[in-house]
Structure formats: C-alpha cells, structure tokens
Regions:
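N-terminal targeting leaders characterized by basic, low-complexity, disordered sequences
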Residues: 1-25
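Detector for glycine-centered tight turns/loop "hinges" at secondary-structure junctions
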Residues: 6, 29, 95-96, 150, ...
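Active-site-adjacent loops and short helices of periplasmic peptidoglycan-processing enzymes
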Residues: 6, 12, 55-231, 235-244
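Positively charged, low-complexity intrinsically disordered regions
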Residues: 9, 34-37, 359, 368
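Bacterial N-terminal signal peptides that target proteins for export
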Residues: 24-41
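Alpha-helical transmembrane segments and their juxtamembrane interfaces
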Residues: 42-46, 124
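C-terminal segment of classical bacterial N-terminal signal peptides
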Residues: 45-54
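Domain-terminus/edge residues, biased toward the C-terminal soluble/receptor-binding domains
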Residues: 224-469
Length: 469
C-alpha cells in the first residue's frame, strides 16, 4: 500500500502474483493486510524523505530526457528520477516523451495487457450488452473477478471485473464475446480477438508489441513470445484514457458487479482496486501487472491542474516499489514544469504594458509603433529540463493608419524545437499614416536615403528576450 503521510488511503487486497510453480492466492487475512499497511507507511515515509525504498533504485544519466540522454543534455543525477524499474516512461497527453529508461526494449507486461482488451471492448460493444461466462473463462485462474461458468453480466460489469481486480476470467469473457462480434463465423473467438489486439496496437503506433492472449499470463500453457515496450504501453494508456467509460472504471477505488448465476439467482461481487496510488496527488487511474518474468509493473494516468501524463514502470522488484517508482516519476515531471511570462522585458509602453517590439511603419521613414502582447499577462508552461527557450518575433507590414489593438506581428516560443506558445503582438499606440504633403516629403526623404544607401523605413526592433528557464 502506498500513501502520502497524512493522506487517506484505502486498504485493498494484494494483486495475485502468478507463479510458474503455482498460483498465489490473494491476501485476505488480517495479518497480511496489516503487513501491507505497514509496508505502505514505510514507502510513504521513504517518498517524503526523497530516498528509494529498496537498494535497487538508481539514477542513470544514460536515461533519456526529451529524446536525448541526460548526459547529452548535461543533466546531473540530482535532476533525474531515482527508480528501480528496468523499463520506464513518462509521456504527455500530446505524445511528448519526457523520460525514458529502456523504453523501447521488448519485455513482458503481464496484466497491463488488459488495457488493450479494454480498448477493443469499448470500441466494439455497448455497455449494456449481455455476456455469458464460459468454462474456459471461469477456469483460467490466477487473478479473477470471481466469475463462474454460466454467469451472465453486462459488458460494463465485465469491464469492471477486468480493470479493477484484474480478472483473467473477465478478460476471456470479453475476448470471446468481442471476437465473435468481430468475426461471427470464427471458430476461435479468442484467437480472433488477439489478432485484433495486435492490429489495433499497430494502428496506435506500437512497434514492439505482440499479444498472444487477452490477459497477459506468460507461463505454463500461456508461455510464448508475448511482449511490449514501455513506450507502447504509454500509447495504449493514452488511447484508453480517451474513453470516458474506461476513465470512470479505472478511477473507481472499489466497485460491485451484479451477476446472474446459471441457476437464475442474482448475486454481487465486491472488488477493490489494485492501484494503491489512486486519488493521491493527481493519480486518476492505472493498471497493474505481475508475473515472474514481467516483474511488478504499473501504468497509470495523472492529472494535476489539467496537465495529464501517462507513466509506465516495468519490472520493478516489489509491489510497493512499482508504486514508489510511479510516484517518483510523476513528482519528477511535475516538479520540473515551470510557468514563465511570455513577455520577458523590463521596458514598458506609454500605457504601462510590456514593450515587446518597436515595429516600423512602412509609409514613414522614421516612425515605429510600440507593440505589446495581445494578452500582456500571458504565460507559457515549459519543462525545465528540455533545454533553452527560443523566441522568434515576426513583424506585419504596417501601412496606413495603425490603431491601438491592431495586430502588428506575432511572437513564437520554442523549446528544443517544439512550439510551446504563439501570441499576437498588437499596437499599443496610435500611428497615423502620412497626409499628401507628408507623403511627398517621405518620397523626397527616401530619394536621399537611396543615394546614401540608408534604410527606407524605420527598422523594426525586438525588445523582449526569450523567457529564461
């Protein structure tokens, strides 16, 4: 259990950890729950103190930050996340990868596989459709939603059984049902579903993923070559969180599902989330996964003040550590997001607004217009480790009369080649065009300027500088 000191936490059963030797039952005894609670406090204290909870946690300057190694960017160890997972990633809602460790290495992802199962389910089904539990689904074993052969439930209830308690039975139920919908003539609905999983992964841009079943078990009869990458997992989580139904399901701390048994009687199942970070510091959902080969895995979504990211940790050493790693990655990312004023200038216009530029009026040889931002208080949010911010100011052709508020140019801010802000420049003073007599004088002035090889209009000048990070 992970909980920040002083925050409310929910005591939930440990995720079943499948073993090649035999299945391990969920922790249900008070003693085991108490041990889990104690572990959560230890982990929370460690997070507060800024130290890893296991000796394996480490900082690697070979990790990637915004597409380059930390070494290449000159980022020191104290500005990098201290995590245990061998493979990890932080990705923004727009697909920007802020951090990666072994992010393209093909590894096992265990029950994180169910994120893709959920995606295909919501894309192919209405939530009130009814599904029936087959013998194959009821007997898959390991982590389950407690479904029995012949049980009938809605797709939504099965989806909850899939994502909240990580039910392998629910995964097979949905795979069989959706596979049959995809190809009504199929003789192997689950195989049809798995094929669709791989096709959908490719459409998402996943380049290192192979699914072989809908639940992620990778041993005994399920042993094979199934694999994915931290980057691919982030793409799946990003896609899943676009769906409101999935967002609501993974945000549920606990849930009940209603099932009609084979004998016609109704009964309910209580389920607790395996996401021990849910609701803490912006965590809005996630999916765990654990097998001997995959280690302890977790992908999650965070949203703080509208800034949404997706984190992935694969092959952490313990249940607690995967959550510590996840919290560390989220805090690292948000801790390096800074807000800067777009108008980085000490000079003011006559109206008291930030002076961004003096832009030449093309009908005059010696007049300029003071330009400010369309929103003088505008700010941009940048990631401080992504490099310096650069500024480009463009000037419009200012002919004729210019009025206060007229667009006179624009400013573009980029960081590491990525556009982070664009804003119009507007006139902050009136600028009349020349009358006929003045226009004649301008022409005479320009004649002399041509002879002397001088500029024919007042030169525009950028006053503001790029914001400092």
């Amino acid at each position: 259990m992970i909980a920040d000191t002083g925050k409310r936490y929910t005591l939930v059963p440990e995720e079943t950890v499948p073993s090649k030797a035999k299945s391990v039952k969920s922790l249900t005894s008070l003693a085991k729950r108490s041990a889990q609670l104690a572990a959560g406090f230890v982990c929370a204290i460690a997070l507060a103190a800024g130290v890893p909870t296991v000796a394996g946690a480490q900082v690697l300057t070979t990790d990637n930050v915004c597409g380059k190694t930390a070494d290449a960017r000159g980022i020191t160890a104290d500005n990098l996340p201290d995590i245990d997972a061998t493979n990890a990633l932080v990705m923004g809602k727009d697909g920007t990868v802020y951090y990666g460790r072994g992010a393209d290495e093909q590894v096992k992802i265990a029950s994180i596989t169910k994120v893709m199962t959920a995606i295909l389910t919501v894309e192919n089904c209405k939530m009130d459709e009814k599904v029936t539990v087959s013998n194959d689904a009821a007997t898959v074993g390991n982590s389950t939603a407690g479904l029995l052969e012949g049980d009938e439930l809605t797709v939504e209830q099965a989806l909850r059984g899939l994502m909240i308690p990580s039910g392998n039975d629910a995964a097979v139920v949905l795979a069989e049902y959706v596979g049959k919908k995809i190809d009504p003539k199929t003789k192997d609905a689950e195989a049809t579903f798995v094929k669709a999983m791989n096709e959908r992964a490719k459409k998402l841009g996943c380049t290192g993923t192979l699914f072989e079943n809908p639940h992620g078990l990778d041993f005994d009869e399920w042993a094979g070559d199934m694999h994915s990458t931290a980057h691919d997992v982030a793409l799946m989580m990003q896609e899943a969180m676009k769906n409101n139904t999935i967002r609501e399901v993974v945000a549920s701390e606990d849930s009940w599902i209603e099932v009609t048994g084979a004998d016609g009687t109704d009964h309910s199942h209580s389920m607790d989330t395996h996401n021990y970070l849910l609701g803490q510091d912006g965590n809005i959902g996630g999916k765990t996964g654990t097998t001997d080969d995959a280690g302890y895995c977790f992908t999650s979504a965070y949203n703080r003040d509208g800034d949404e990211i997706y984190t992935v940790v694969l092959n952490s050493t313990t249940t607690d550590q995967r959550f510590t790693d996840t919290a560390t990655l989220a805090n690292w990312y948000y801790g390096h997001k800074v807000t800067v004023a777009i108008a980085n200038t000490q000079e003011k216009t006559a109206n008291g607004n930030p002076l961004m530029a003096r832009i030449g009026q093309t009908d005059w040889t010696d007049k300029t217009i003071d330009a400010t931002l369309a929103d003088p208080t505008a700010q941009a949010t940048v990631f401080s480790l992504a490099g310096e911010v650069t500024e480009k100011v463009s000037y419009d052709d200012l002919s004729g009369t210019v009025h206060v508020g007229d667009k006179v140019g624009s400013v573009t801010l980029k960081q590491d080649g990525t556009k982070i802000a664009v804003m119009d420049l507007v006139a902050d003073e009136e600028g009349a065009g020349p009358n006929p007599i003045e226009w004649l004088l301008v022409k005479l002035d320009r004649l002399g300027r041509r002879i002397d090889n001088r500029p024919l209009t007042a030169e525009s000048e950028t006053v503001a500088k790029a914001p400092e990070v």
